[in-house]
Amino acid sequence: MQRRTFLRLFLAFFGMAFASATEVHAQDAGWQKEIAVFREKRAAGLQKPDGWLSLVGLEWLQPGDTSVGSAPDNKVKLSAVHPAHLGIFHLENNTVTLLPPTDGFPAGLTVGGAPAKQQVLRADADNDQNNPHLLIGTLNLYAIRREDRFALRIKDAHSPSLQKFHGLNWYAPDSAFRVTAKWTPYSPAKTVQLATLVGTSYPAPVPGVAEFALQGKTYRLEPVLEDPKATDLFFILRDTTSATTTYGACRFLYTPFPPNGLDKPGELVLDFNRLQNPPCAYTPYATCPLPPPGNRLPVALAAGEQRYHE
């Protein structure tokens, strides 16, 4: 009788342990699949015709006229396959105006989806989403503003970087770098001045701080909000791998808001396997923000994206 009871208890315990192990394995397999999908989307995004690998120029505008085209008399020279005279970008009183070249705009040039005409080009400070794009052939141009400086960003769907792309380098997924962090909101939210790689800076709201434990020590990271409609927290950070295997300036991490919102204490998951390089890792023509002092961690985050090599 006692043997039967013991056997039943043993089988019940073994069954629960097996079920628990199966559930953990299923959860791990699901997470691994999520990471694989994330990495596939990451590479696909970079390879879009207007993705970061398509950047071929960043031309800072000086007051007055800046002519653009493939002819040698232009201030900004495009490759020979593009129109000889594309247009003139006139900067005056913090306003960029598109003017036609002497022989008129080239056939097929559109601005914001409409045929090109003389017009003021919108260039919001440190937010390029609403700026109208000039499109012709494989070219994509638009004005950007960084503080009181204006530039012309030039993309080409047939850029050398796109043609040479051979994939990204990643650490193997490691669940040890997927941590639950304590979220503490700031009330009111504070503002940090973010420096950039091109020597400018801009203010960004910091809604709170995430505190987490890793390898027996506690660390803190402050995220910013990229824009008022953001649904993800944006962490700009640097760790000790930046000096060896990852991009030297910083890496980015996007993570959803805490389940109970930004304005209440709570928790959120920081999956450092999703750390990604900033655009500046792939092109010298980006204007990437740098991490605030508190986001430079004295720990090796051997997870996520590694240095990119052409």
Residue ranges: model-predicted function:
Residues 182-242, 247:
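Flexible, glycine-rich surface segments
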Residues 10-19:
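Bacterial N-terminal signal peptides
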Residues 167-168, 240-242, 266-269, 273-310:
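Extended, aromatic/histidine-rich regions of cofactor-dependent oxidoreductases associated
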Residues 19-26:
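Boundary at the C-terminal end of the N-terminal hydrophobic targeting segment
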Residues 3-7:
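N-terminal export leaders
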